[in-house]
């Protein structure tokens, strides 16, 4: 490894990269860490981080929505299937210290949010190919929208039925 490389690792299932970076930076950009944790479906971790920011419920819900949208935009077989190329999205986000300002100012957020909601509706319209109290299996069509929504859909299934395994 490079002599300047410093590794930060936490194997806890309740810790994501955003939480590790937040810890390393001493919470300087904690609102972005909240967004990242929500995007990774670590709602309890995100909520704990958000409590340190003294945010109201509406603000926390907005950070959750942004995290889910950014996560949704990361799914696809190739960057061509994404709504916004990751480099372009990073370029747009980089100018904002606060995620709420990004969400309010950048029309790309509304574009991603609208597409995610449309795709979630399509995914929820599908019946599982097999389901019981312990497991539910969903087969999504071979289409870009279904690859984009697979993570968001799986996360929602897991949140709605935490005692049941889900295959998407």
Q: What residues fall within each predicted segment?
A:
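Accessory alpha-helical/coil subdomains and C-terminal extensions
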Residues: 45-125
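Gly/His-enriched, cation/cofactor- and phosphate-binding structural elements
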Residues: 91-168
